[in-house]
């Protein structure tokens, strides 16, 4: 196992339960080592940007936090609970990469957002007024009210991502994992989501975002995390995004471009 050289983020009160806690997690896919003793904590009310090259383990880390991938060793807690509990109770929400979604599926934007309410529907499984209002509110927050009846695949890349963010909001998720939400999005969607993530964090939610957009990190995130199978560094974007740290995460060739 490689030695972790992470720098702690802002201090968390000793009695506060971390929103996300990962301890010495190792994951293999067959003979391929995806995570090697990864450890991290993210406090409630923070936006954290996850940075690493392709194959560094970002998606595996998210899947492990979601409980979709079982680690070979180590522990994961979400709001102090098992990830499965956090998902079942709606505490944990997830926005997948665009490649993971069938955009031709015959479902409207409103239907996608309503999926966030499924765990809270009553015995009849029919949306109640409270569910409809939650969906309306979520659509308004991501500026998609006028697109609610459109088939999801008819939206632009940025609008699609905003629809899945709205699903998390309608769900009432307090911890959100977003896998490359800014990949292939328009400037309006990027600005809308950046503003929204800050509003959600100011309201006590935790937003964990993987991104390749390094220049945008200081505006987007309270803290940044460099990953290369384990956490290389975790702290403020200014401290983390230093040339030596990025060289360790991406390799010297990247830094020379």
Question: For each predicted feature, which ranges?
Answer:
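The feature captures the beta-strand-to-loop junction immediately N-terminal to the Walker
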Residues: 51-53
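Helix-to-loop junction immediately C-terminal to a conserved catalytic motif
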Residues: 66
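Conserved ABC transporter NBD signature motif
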Residues: 74-88
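Conserved ABC ATPase "signature" region
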Residues: 114, 128-147
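Conserved ABC ATPase signature
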Residues: 151-155, 159
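Catalytic Walker B motif of ABC-type/P-loop ATPase nucleotide-binding domains
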Residues: 176-180
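H-loop (His-switch) and adjacent beta-strand-loop-beta switch element
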Residues: 223-237
């Amino acid at each position: 196992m490689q030695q972790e050289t992470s720098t702690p983020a802002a201090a968390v009160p000793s009695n506060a339960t971390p929103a996300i806690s990962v301890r010495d997690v190792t994951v293999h896919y067959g003979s391929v080592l995806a995570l090697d003793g990864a450890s991290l904590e993210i406090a409630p009310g923070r936006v954290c940007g996850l940075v690493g090259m392709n194959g560094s383990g970002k998606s595996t880390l998210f899947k492990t936090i979601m409980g979709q991938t079982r680690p070979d060793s180590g522990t994961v807690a979400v709001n102090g609970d098992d990830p499965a509990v956090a998902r079942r109770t709606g505490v944990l929400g997830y926005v997948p990469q665009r490649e993971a979604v069938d955009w031709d599926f015959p479902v409207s934007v409103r239907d996608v957002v309503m999926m966030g309410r499924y765990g809270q529907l009553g015995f009849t499984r029919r949306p109640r007024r409270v569910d409809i209002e939650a969906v309306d509110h979520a659509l308004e927050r991501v500026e998609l009210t006028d697109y609610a009846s459109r088939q999801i695949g008819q939206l632009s890349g940025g609008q699609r991502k905003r629809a899945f963010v709205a699903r998390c909001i309608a769900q009432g998720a307090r911890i959100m994992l977003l896998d490359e939400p800014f990949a292939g999005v328009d400037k309006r969607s990027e600005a809308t989501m950046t503003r929204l993530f800050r509003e959600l964090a100011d309201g006590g939610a935790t937003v964990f975002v993987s991104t390749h957009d390094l220049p945008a990190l200081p505006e987007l995130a309270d803290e940044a995390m460099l990953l290369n199978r384990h956490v290389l560094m975790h702290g403020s974007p200014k401290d983390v995004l230093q040339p030596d740290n990025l060289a360790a995460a991406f390799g010297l060739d990247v830094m020379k471009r």
